[in-house]
From Swiss-Prot:
Its EC number is 4.3.1.3. It catalyses: L-histidine = trans-urocanate + NH4(+). Contains an active site 4-methylidene-imidazol-5-one (MIO), which is formed autocatalytically by cyclization and dehydration of residues Ala-Ser-Gly. The modification 2,3-didehydroalanine (Ser) is found at residue 143. Disulfide bonds: none annotated. The keyword Mitochondrion does not apply. GO terms for biological process: L-histidine catabolic process to glutamate and formamide; L-histidine catabolic process to glutamate and formate. It comes from the Bacteria. InterPro entries: Aromatic_Lyase, Fumarase/histidase_N, HutH, L-Aspartase-like, Phe/His_NH3-lyase_AS. It holds the Pfam family Lyase_aromatic. This is Histidine ammonia-lyase. Its main location: cytoplasm. CDD domains: PAL-HAL.
């Protein structure tokens, strides 16, 4: 099944299918017609010798340098090569694939001035699964993601490297095997390819998809912990949460009630104790607040995915060619910093639940869930690992968006650092998943002490799936492997491709 790009209607759900399920893309014919019409404007500007930034001038501080007609093609090639200054490890393939898709989508708005050939080449790369090797570091987030997108543009020219059929190869190797010819960029096309926010946005979309799945998983794992600690179910009563009024909080409480509806391990208020600690009692309030963050982030991503972030932009059949600043990544920088905080908090509260599962002063379970306390340490150091991860997250959660540094001889004197924010958000999500993996290992062990037969239908099913990944703790062993196995399972096999539907599990 192909997803049609229009420049206006792309959604996160469609990106999930494109990035994680390998679906292909096609261009809306009406949108392609707009691309062709806009291109005619650019060619007339070049033919008439008009002075228009980015078309017949240099770039950045060189915007006052007029480029002769015969040098326009050389200008495009020089731009791409000189701006390909990315450094560090490459983005995941899903991100570079996302960059191709988002760049094509923004061009289909018909205000960038590229030839339809350029859009078609981007789509060919997507559909043939030729993904540029794009270094993660080197972007200031304004003028957009210049360095990362230059590495994307290189491969269209037959330069640079790509991921192709499971290997990292020179771009020409993939082009030759697929029977594709590299393109030669013409006026405006180099700038149209690299002036935008598609690196931070593509990474942001992947981060959001993983964060959404992780947030659902956090509720299921927290529910297992509630059982392991014989938590008080009254705290999740609908009346409590409707009295506050936040929809996300109400929804979390509702899902946890559904998960635990037939559990024999939860207790009533006053049965064992009057109230639970905040890390149990306030799950809906805390997790619900993280869902508020996720909803905000999704909204901003879907706007940016369909945004014209090029410069200059061409309107009204060429009557207006305007230099603006839509390449500035501040909206995504803020959204990614917000995502970092919202996800880090899920790990913070999870680590506190881990402590309550392993600390003998806080429960009636064996110390550190050890089969032979003293002789065997059990889950003692797993809590250390979780504490380390949440502390690392606190450092990564420092906002990148409050930083700025001038560039291009002070012409570009304020930047967003949105790509740094987006990269750090993804790192935090990996850490959160590992903390939740530790909580799950501890919660499964606690459930065994309480009696698996007493678990709810949903948590019992989840327990058995988890036990297919890691065995019960009968003796001390290398727990690092267990943590990574659960984390890998949560990411790839449980609900990364489709969000957890609790009701379907009931």
């Amino acid at each position: 099944m192909m997803i049609t790009l229009t420049g206006h209607t792309l959604t996160v759900e469609e990106m999930k299918r494109l990035l994680l399920e390998g679906e292909g893309v096609t261009a809306c014919p009406t949108s392609m017609q707009k691309v062709a019409e806009c291109r005619e404007v650019v060619e007339k500007i070049v033919e008439d010798g008009k002075v228009v930034y980015g078309i017949t001038t240099g770039f950045g501080k060189f915007s006052d340098v007029l480029i002769q007609k015969d040098d326009v093609k050389a200008l495009q090639h020089n731009l791409i090569q000189s701006h390909a200054c990315g450094i560090g490890d490459p983005f995941p393939e899903e991100v570079s694939r996302g960059m191709l898709i988002l760049r094509a989508n923004t061009m289909l708005k018909g205000v960038s001035g590229v030839r339809p050939l350029v859009v078609n080449m981007l789509l060919e790369f997507v559909n043939r699964k030729i993904h540029p090797v794009v270094p993660q570091q080197g972007s200031l987030g304004a003028s957009g993601d210049l360095a990362p997108l230059s590495h994307l543009a290189l491969v269209l020219l037959g330069e640079g490297e790509v991921f192709y059929k499971g290997k990292r190869v020179h771009a020409m190797v993939a082009l030759t095997e697929e029977g594709l010819e590299p393109i030669e960029l013409e006026a405006k096309e180099g700038l149209a390819l690299i002036n935008g926010t598609q690196a931070m946005t593509a990474q942001g979309v992947l981060s959001y998809i993983e964060a959404e799945a992780t947030a659902y998983q956090a509720e299921l794992i927290a529910s297992m912990t509630i059982e392991g600690l014989q938590g008080i179910i009254d705290a999740f009563d609908e009346n409590v949460h409707k009295a506050r009024g936040y929809k996300e909080q109400v929804d979390v409480a509702s899902r946890i009630r559904d998960i635990l509806h037939d559990s024999k391990l939860t207790t009533k208020q006053g049965e064992l104790r009057v109230q639970d600690a905040y890390s149990l009692r306030c799950i809906p309030q805390v997790h619900g607040a993280s869902w508020q963050v996720l909803n905000y982030v999704k909204e901003k991503l879907e706007i940016e995915m369909n945004a014209a972030t090029d410069n200059p932009l061409i309107f009204d059949g060429g009557e207006k060619v305007i230099s603006g600043g839509n390449f500035h990544g501040q909206p995504i920088a803020f959204a990614m910093d917000f995502l970092k905080v919202g996800m880090a908090e899920l790990a913070n509260i999870s680590e506190r639940r881990i402590e309550r599962l392993v600390n003998p002063q806080l429960n009636d379970l064996p110390p550190f869930l050890s089969p032979e306390p003293g002789l065997q340490s059990g889950a003692m150091i797993m809590q250390y690992a979780a504490a380390s991860l949440v502390s690392e997250n606190k450092t990564l959660a420092h906002p990148a968006s409050v930083d700025s540094i001038p560039s291009s001889a002070n012409q570009e004197d304020h930047v967003s650092m949105g790509t740094i924010a987006s990269r750090h958000a993804h790192q935090i999500i990996q850490n959160v998943r590992r903390v939740l993996s530790i909580e799950m290992i501890c919660a499964m062990q606690a459930a065994e002490y309480r009696g698996i037969e007493n678990m709810s239908t949903v948590t019992k099913s989840f327990y058995h799936q988890g036990r297919q990944q890691v065995p019960s703790i009968k003796n001390d062993r290398i727990f690092s492997t267990d943590i990574e196995n659960i984390a890998h399972w949560l990411k790839t096999n449980y609900s990364i491709k489709e969000r957890l539907d609790v009701n379907a599990a009931l």
